[in-house]
Amino acid sequence: MKKKFICAVAIGALVVGCKPAMDLDKPGAVNAEKLVSAASNDAEWLSYGRTYDEQRFSPLNAINAENVSGLNLAWFADLDTSRGQEATPLVIDGKIYISTAWSKVKAYDAVSGKLLWEYDPKVPGETAVKACCDVVNRGVAAWGDRLYLGTL
C-alpha cells in the first residue's frame, strides 16, 4: 500500500512539473515508427540519444579526417546563459530544438541558424537553490506535432 502511494505521488509530481506542450511547426513530426526506426534516418535527431537504444552516435560521414581541417563556421547561436548546458538538441524537419538553463526552449532553422521562436516558462529564480546540480535539464521530447518540457 505504501509503495502504491509513493508511486502515485511521484507520478503526480511529474505531471504537475510538466509545462504544456509547445507546437512544432509541422504536424505529425514524430511517432512510434519514426522513433523505432531512427537508426535508419540520418537526417534527424528525434530523441535524447538519437536512436531507440540511446546510442548517441551519428552515422553521418561527410566530415572525416581528410576534410575536417577545411571546415568553417556556418552559424552559431548565443544561448543567453552563463549557466550549465547539458541538453541534447533535437533535429526534426530541418529545425533544431534546444532547451537551455532555466528550462527555456529555442527553435532554429538548421541551415541558416535563424531563430524561429523561443519559450521561457519563467522558472522562479529561487528554484535554483533547490536543484542539486544547477538549473540545467536534459532537453525536450517530441511526440506527434508537439514538444514536451519538464521544468524545475
State where each predicted segment sits.
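C-terminal motif of bacterial Sec signal peptides marking the signal peptidase cleavage site
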Residues: 15-17
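Aromatic (tryptophan-biased) beta-strands that constitute blades/sheets of beta-rich domains
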Residues: 22-79, 114-129
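Repetitive helical segments and hydrophobic/amphipathic motifs
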Residues: 11-13
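Bacterial N-terminal signal peptides that target proteins for export
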Residues: 1-6
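Repeat-blade elements of multi-bladed beta-propeller folds
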Residues: 45-49, 84-104, 129-152
